[in-house]
Amino acid sequence: MDKFRVQGRTRLSGEVAISGAKNAALPILFAALLAEEPVELQNVPKLKDIDTTIKLLNQLGTKIERNGSVFVDASGVNEFCAPYDLVKTMRASIWALGPLVARFGRGQVSLPGGCAIGARPVDLHITGLEQLGAEIKLEEGYVKASVDGRLKGAHIVMDKVSVGATVTIMSAATLATGTTVIENAAREPEIVDTANFLNTLGAKITGAGSDRITIEGVERLGGGVYRVLPDRIETGTFLIAAAVSGGKVMCRDTRPDTLDAVLAKLREAGADIEVGEDWISLDMHGKRPKAVTIRTAPHPGFPTDMQAQFSLLNLVAEGTGVITETIFENRFMHVPELIRMGAHAEIESNTVICHGVEQLSGAQVMATDLRASASLVIAGCIADGVTVVDRIYHIDRGYERIEDKLRALGANIERVKGE
């Protein structure tokens, strides 16, 4: 397995171009199964999870070419089963189910794998599709969905806010007869992006970005060209890299309006921040950040995917900061690794109390999930000595060429190929 070897005590400064959002590109790629004509997707990041999705769509009979843009032609889909060998590495595969049953009347997906953070049940996807008229069976480790004729619009009140299930229901409802209303829908920017993509193909979706989404079913979806929105979590990660190192960074090709909660907390931590239409600059003027208190929440609250990075900020900040994780259980696995580097923290159920220290020390640490691993790499950049981060395949699932981008900011980082 590959590792990162990072030589520390670096102040990270410079410019970074932000890639397309993984969490928008994935649902959009699966939603392209609904289209009867070719689709061109621009700004799709080059990531492990994207490669897995392309393989999976290929197995279903979709023709895909990657040549700058990703070209998807789902007119020849002739397989309706997403097999275990691909699904096991990535939970997002469940997003194949809604489009398959909506367009072809049947689909089956192996129960999924992916990051090791807590229970992310598929039951909300299943109940949503059942309310649209699909018959669902769980057999031999597969979720099997079928419907006679077309799905039927329904008024769906979601038990809890779920990005994944909102995508499944919204995508499937585009080809249902009648109108579907989703109440208590997720409001994330990636939901809005998926809805905008589907509307480009001829869907009739309104209200995305609010907690009430309305979908008027249409007979078919055509083709189109769509540009995936920039990755707000990658943006936030590079802003943190500058903030914890006393540095200065300019993030280009990004969307400041998707990062309100994160920018507010960075300002509270003492960062000098300016924004334009598609850029954000952060300058710490060489100062240490101040500790902040954070509680993760569904959008527009503070994103759980930035929690690990802000844990690092608090652990090297002036003062004591408290972080409460309300979205996923078991999402503090990076904290014991940072303690190995000299951080002072206590975990109490879903809360971590961070006592800032002036300097971390290099150590051997292990990545446990995608966002945790990014915080460990950045910790290595500012620690005294050498840090080796193991199991970095987690990082490759969600960050495009993170080592190249960090190097451009002055980091001393190399990828060590594993056996």
From Swiss-Prot:
Gene Ontology CC: one annotated term: cytoplasm
GO molecular function, one term: UDP-N-acetylglucosamine 1-carboxyvinyltransferase activity
Modified residues (2-(S-cysteinyl)pyruvic acid O-phosphothioketal): 115
Reactions catalysed: phosphoenolpyruvate + UDP-N-acetyl-alpha-D-glucosamine = UDP-N-acetyl-3-O-(1-carboxyvinyl)-alpha-D-glucosamine + phosphate
Domain of life of the source: Bacteria
Family to which the UniProt record says this protein belongs: Belongs to the EPSP synthase family. MurA subfamily.
Role according to the record: Cell wall formation. Adds enolpyruvyl to UDP-N-acetylglucosamine.
Record protein name field: UDP-N-acetylglucosamine 1-carboxyvinyltransferase
Organism: Serratia proteamaculans (strain 568)
Designated gene of the protein: murA
